[in-house]
Every structure is written in structure tokens, then in C-alpha cells.
A protein has these predicted regions:
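Boundary at the C-terminal end of the N-terminal hydrophobic targeting segment
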Residues: 18-20
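N-terminal cationic leader/targeting segments used for protein routing and processing
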Residues: 4-5, 23
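N-terminal accessory beta-strand-rich subdomains and adjacent acidic, glycine-rich linkers
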Residues: 25-239
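Sec-dependent N-terminal signal peptides
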Residues: 5-14
């Protein structure tokens, strides 16, 4: 009986470990860039690979909406993938009059009325949260982690608060020496020796810009909190 009980216990533990994590992978059209979404029992993380080599691993990814952390205890309900090959012509062309958009995209659906769209390009990756909530959405916070070694060189535009005109000069500092209490605007450049990582964002509408600050494992995102009220400040501003 003890042998059967022990065997049953081991089988149960094995089943729990198998269900504890699922990984969804999206790869660039040339097969060199890879983003892996790790669906744990209680959280989401992501890994980045280039040419088979790990660039960033076990990076935190999450979001809290309307007081609920939708990425806690994530339950995947399905996924779909597609290849995107199109030419984008900006209404107001700046550097290019035509931009080639070539990537592989995977949309991962979750039980808490949200999806995560992952894209892998030949020169980078991108992601986006998409909700299926009918009511008005208020984002409490978004979690983005960048786990980098302490000897990476950072090229950052430093600021001590969220009120910035984005005119500060860029400074160059090692990640392990970047002091706490200081943030960086985007874009920021990380020299990871094996490759260089440019972190940026796009398509912001009614959403605050991200900043990045020092964390115990590298860098973490910080966002301006939603103001509870506005009042005039000087002759042409609100605060």
C-alpha cells in the first residue's frame, strides 16, 4: 500500500509540474529572433533569444485593470498565428515614405477577458495587451521587467520625476552602477555585449509613456499614476 501511495503521490506531483507552465513561442521570418511567453500557474514571464542564444530570460510581464490583476493565475484558452507582410505609407513621411512591415504574430487568449499579441520581426520583438471587457477600462499598473547583467552598458536619458520635456542629454552608465531614484525615458539602449537592445514603445493613445528604473534584477518599468484632480499651473499648464 505504501508503494502504491508513494507512486500515486509522485504521479500527482508530476501532473502538477506539467500543468504549472506552458510556453508559447513566436519566431521571426528569418528564424533568428525568438520570443517565448511562459505561462506559469501564478504569473506570466517572457524570454528573448537571438540565433539560439538567450538574450533576456525570466522577465516579468503583467497588468492590473480596474483593481484586478488580470495576469495573476493566467488560464490560456487558445492561440492563433499569422504572418504579416505589408507596406505602410505614413500620412506624414519622416525618414521613409514607405515602411515594410514583415513579422510573425501570435495572439494568445486568456480566461480573464484579455489577450496578449506577440510579434517577432527580423530585428526585434513586440507585444500588446488586448482586453475584451465591455465596460470602461482603467489601467492601474503595467509590469515590464528587463533582466540584464550588472555589467551591461546603458545609454539612458535620466530624469528624477515624470515631469520632463525629454530634453535631458543621454548618459552612459553600467547597469550595476545606475543609482536608484533615477529613471530613464524611452527610447533607451542596452549594450548586452552579444547584441544591442533598443527599448521603445508605439501607438500610445490615452495611455502614459513608460519610464524605466533600476531593479534588483536589471530594469523595471514605471508609469505616471493617474491624477485624481487637475489644477492650473503657471499660465498654460495643468498639474
Amino acid at each position: 500500500i505504501m508503494k502504491k501511495l508513494t507512486l500515486l503521490t509522485l504521479m500527482c506531483c508530476l501532473c502538477l509540474s506539467l500543468w504549472a507552465q506552458k510556453t508559447v513561442t513566436v519566431t521571426s521570418p528569418d528564424g533568428k529572433v525568438e520570443m517565448r511567453l511562459n505561462i506559469h500557474a501564478d504569473k506570466l514571464t517572457y524570454d528573448l533569444y537571438h540565433a539560439g542564444n538567450a538574450v533576456l530570460t525570466d522577465n516579468a510581464l503583467g497588468m492590473q485593470i480596474n483593481g484586478q490583476e488580470i495576469t495573476a493565475h493566467p488560464k490560456m484558452t487558445g492561440q492563433r498565428s499569422k504572418h504579416i507582410q505589408e507596406t505602410i505609407c505614413p500620412v506624414v513621411p519622416l525618414k521613409f515614405s514607405a515602411i515594410e512591415n514583415n513579422c510573425n504574430e501570435t495572439t494568445v487568449n486568456f480566461k480573464n477577458q484579455f489577450s496578449l499579441v506577440l510579434r517577432a520581426y527580423n530585428d526585434g520583438v513586440a507585444y500588446r495587451f488586448v482586453t475584451r471587457l465591455k465596460e470602461q477600462v482603467e489601467v492601474d499598473y503595467e509590469t515590464i521587467g528587463l533582466n540584464i547583467p550588472n555589467d551591461c552598458m546603458l545609454h539612458v536619458q535620466e530624469t528624477e520625476n515624470f515631469w520632463t520635456s525629454y530634453e535631458e542629454p543621454y548618459v552612459h552608465v553600467k547597469s550595476g552602477e545606475w543609482k536608484e531614484g533615477v529613471m530613464s525615458t524611452l527610447p533607451l539602449l542596452i549594450d548586452a555585449k552579444s547584441c544591442k537592445l533598443l527599448v521603445s514603445e508605439a501607438d500610445l493613445r490615452d495611455y502614459p509613456c513608460a519610464f524605466f528604473a533600476h531593479a534588483s534584477t536589471g530594469l523595471k518599468a514605471a508609469f505616471p499614476p493617474m491624477p485624481t484632480r487637475f489644477e492650473p499651473w503657471y499660465d498654460r499648464r495643468l498639474k
